[in-house]
Amino acid sequence: MTRQAPDPRITERRNPRTANIDLASAIEIVDLMNAEDRTVADAVATQREEIAHVVSLTEDAFRRDGRLFYVGAGTSGRLGILDASECPPTFGSEPEMVQGIIAGGFPAILRAQEGAEDSPAGGAAVMDEHDVGERDVVVGIAASGTTPFVHGALQRARARGARTAIVACTPLSEKLLAMVDVAIIAVVGPEVVTGSTRLKAGTATKMVLNMITTGAMIRIGKTYGNLMVDLKATNEKLKDRSERIVAEVCGIPRDEARTLLSAAGMRVKTAIVMYKLSVDRAGAEEALAAAGGTIRRVVTDAPPPVPT
């Protein structure tokens, strides 16, 4: 029997540690998957400098009123949409600031759209539709690094002057590397189920995206210490969190924090500055605007210590 050469894409190779997983019990399957997943964080850590570079590019884009776009297909596209959709409630950002684009459009979020990922022209067109330009950052997401839709988007984004990056889980071709300013390549190895990149590759990708958006948002002043001071209180849980943050930072009872938040238009940052500087809402908003929205430049006190 002729022996086939291994697929150059590590994400498509068979995992020798799970070759007989179909004979495993439920607990054995869980243990095998858990053992594989423990390697993911280490793979991501090898890319710390590249991830930090993209954080800095994104910070610069945000400071120039630019945007961050994630572009992917299938699981990769969905992960981009997931990360983008969490930014407004977490950091009080406008929905346009971080956007996730998936090959096949909205229907592809719930159901695979056959052939959509195979069109580089489709990726290029979506960059034109969003008028991507020099103030923007475009991050392609492709576990195997071979998605034509992503390649097309990156090429067009670069031609339009945007900064570009790719998140992948297998070594990339020189041609693809030439399309991007930064390549984040978290090699997690073959999947538990061959080619199922929703597993380790998906986990690694989500970790990287978390770092990009969270890092950039922190850098532009969206937190005070590790407190979420720019959140939008869109539900009861977030209203409760807003009250707890104001009460903790200002050292006041919850009912007083609630009243202060109401006077501040439910903006945590504004409420804290109103209390700390003994000013009204307009005065707090003016002070924050002068400080570029960074609360540390207005309130010189360190955040309260973490309760033990």
Question: What do the predicted segments below correspond to?
Answer:
Residues 1-43, 47:
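Cofactor-/ligand-binding subdomain signature composed of acidic, glycine-rich
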Residues 11, 32-40, 100-111, 224, ...:
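Gly-rich Lys/Arg/Thr-decorated short loops/hinges at beta-loop-alpha junctions or inter-strand turns
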Residues 46-61:
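A short, well-structured juxtamembrane/interface segment
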Residues 49, 111-112, 201, 233-235:
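Active-site pocket-shaping loop/turn-to-helix segments
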Residues 61-62, 157:
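A generic structural signal for well-ordered alpha-helical segments
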Residues 69-208, 213-220:
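Glycine-rich phosphate-binding loops that contact phosphosugars or nucleotide phosphates
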